[in-house]
Structure formats: C-alpha cells, structure tokens
Design a protein with these regions (language model features):
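Residue-level signal for short hydrophobic patches within transmembrane helices
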Residues: 9, 13-32, 60-67, 143, ...
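Small-residue-rich hydrophobic transmembrane alpha-helices
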Residues: 51-111, 148-167
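Internal metal/ion-chelating core segments
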Residues: 159-192
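Residue-level recognition of transmembrane alpha-helices
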Residues: 20, 27, 55-58, 102, ...
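Interfacial/gating helices of multi-pass transporter permease domains
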Residues: 41-62, 129-133
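Short alpha-helical transmembrane segments in multi-pass integral membrane proteins
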Residues: 1-20, 79-144, 180, 184, ...
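Generic alpha-helical transmembrane segments of integral inner-membrane proteins
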Residues: 24, 28, 32, 36, ...
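Helix-loop interface residues and adjacent transmembrane-helix termini in multi-pass membrane transporters
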Residues: 32-35, 45-48, 82-85, 160-161, ...
C-alpha cells in the first residue's frame, strides 16, 4: 500500500485533505493520551489528588510534545524540498542529522526537566496535596522524552515524503500501548 503522495499534482483540495486528515487525526489521538489517563483509568480507580496530579502532568507533557513537534517541522520541509529536487544525498544527510539531533536533544531536555520539574510544578501552582504525585507522574513522563522526540522526528521525515498515514498508525499503536500500560500499572499495581 502506497502511503506517500505528491502534493503538487492533481486536485489540490483533494490532495491536501488526503494528506492533512491523517495528520489531524494523529494530533487528536495524541491529545487523547491524557484524556485516556484521566477519564478511563485515573478517574475510575484513583482519588482526587491523583486526578489533579495527572491533569497537571499531562499539561506539562503536552507542552513539551508540542514544542518538539514544532521543532521537527524543519526536517519535514527539508525532506520535502530535497525529495522534490530529487537530491537523495541531501535527504540522507537530513535524515541522519534529524535523528541524531533529536536523540541528543532528548537527553538534554530530559536532564533539564529532571532538575526543574519541582520548579515547573510550583509555577503551575499545583495544590500541595497533589504535588508529590504530580512530580512522580511528570518524572515518569520524562523517561519517555527520547521516544517522543524520535517519534516526532520519524513522523516529520515521513510527512516530508508525503506519508501522513504511517505516523497516524504509529500514534494509534502508541495510544493502545499507553492505555494498556496505564491499566496494568494503575489497576494491577494499585498505583495511586
């Protein structure tokens, strides 16, 4: 099944809709990560302090993910440009640079967040009753920064080739894993 599309040929409205709808659905699914945590699992099995902690942690994670996603747009543009010009050597360099940059960026960002989580939560005025759990939740999310960076980097590269379906499938699989992981840790380990 071919997932790539030329965005410069054919009916522009149809082509853009075919490309953008999976992109929008992927963003919607990603936003539902936090909703799944809150409504389906934490809200059903944990006390109010846990709900406040996850709600705050989800906001922090969403901001971080949005920044990472925005930074990867440069790679999308470069891959699309070089693919259009049929310059495979420059595409390879862009891919290598993007993957390497975001791997290093994820390490640096994780370290910064690990040392500043308490300050961030204070700036967000997290209630004292939820502070410890919010810190714990954000810290757990920080361990996934590498995967968030690399997912967004790979998705950006694929979108540069005109493939917005594969990133949608990746984020759908990640949502299923997220919900399963949440159920496993919260329900079976009675994590509050």
């Amino acid at each position: 099944m071919k997932h790539t599309a030329s965005l410069t040929q054919g009916n522009i409205l149809q082509v853009l809709l075919r490309f953008s709808i999976p992109f929008l659905l992927a963003n919607l699914l990603h936003a539902l990560y936090g909703a799944a945590d809150l409504m389906m699992i934490i809200g059903a099995y944990c006390p109010a302090e846990s709900i406040a902690a996850v709600s705050t942690g989800t906001q922090v994670t969403q901001i971080i993910t949005s920044v990472i996603s925005g930074l990867t747009l440069g790679a999308t543009i470069l891959v699309a440009k070089y693919a259009g010009r049929q310059q495979p050597d420059k595409i390879e360099k862009t891919i290598g640079t993007t993957i390497t940059f975001f791997a290093l960026f994820s390490i640096i960002l994780s370290l910064i967040l690990a040392f500043s989580t308490g300050m961030i939560l204070q700036l967000l005025q997290v209630p004292q009753a939820s502070m410890a759990q919010a810190y714990q939740y954000v810290f757990i999310c920080i361990t996934g920064i590498f995967f968030i960076c690399e997912y967004n980097a790979f998705s950006a590269l694929l979108r540069g080739y005109g493939d917005s379906i594969s990133p949608l499938l990746f984020v759908a699989a990640a949502c299923v894993c997220n919900i399963a992981g949440d159920l496993f840790t919260v329900v079976f380990f009675i994590w509050e």
